């Protein structure tokens, strides 16, 4: 997958800056309070603005580096997930459409993906990573129209140990097989009603997208999702993958 980041990079960075606004404010207030408390506030307004400007430039540079690293890693993640998907389907003699209502094939695919997804998450400075497939394991269920298969991993801490990963979405037995226990609010499949622009995303005619801040179902966690489309060589929309950025 070749993604052109130049056309949307500025708007994406702006959106990330909005999400981090309160952090900037906190840093500024903390600096100001510290200067007052320790009697280091200069006698001129110019001194204060200079110190504040240094802090702002430092934060902005860190955010730019964070975004560049995350964007590059997401490209690699998407390439990896597409390759695993197409290789697994080819080995089983299946088309993507034949994953529908095929629990054995979906099990095999998620089993192949979970370890690689975990490795990308462990290397990232993010709170979660996911791959969501545009198929469902059982279309006879009442809510099957809004359910999609895939794997969603989260970090319990910002460490890099596999023991700190939990399974938020995906087949529980696969997670346990790889030493990853289910989240306390685990569900097997994704609920796409939480993605109001899903039908638009299915067109796959975008490089990447950052969601609005959403609250994860049944939790108090507020997050944004970086979303990159998974599209086959024949134009088939496979699904989405990306990273979770926690507001906390």
Placement of each model-derived feature along the sequence:
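Solvent-exposed loop/turn segments at secondary-structure junctions
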Residues: 136-138, 216-217, 245-248
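Short, Lys/Arg-rich, polar N-terminal cytosolic tail immediately upstream
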Residues: 1-9
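Residues embedded in well-ordered secondary-structure elements
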Residues: 45, 63, 118-120, 214-219
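Solvent-exposed, extracytoplasmic
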Residues: 112-117, 240-248
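Extracytoplasmic/periplasmic sensory segments of membrane signal-transduction proteins
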Residues: 71-196
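Extracytoplasmic/periplasmic ligand-binding sensor regions of membrane-associated signaling proteins
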Residues: 167-244
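Juxtamembrane extracytoplasmic/periplasmic/luminal helical "stalk" adjacent to the first N-terminal
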Residues: 10-20, 25-108, 125
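Structured loops at beta-to-helix junctions and adjacent beta-edge loops in soluble globular domains
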Residues: 132-134, 228, 246
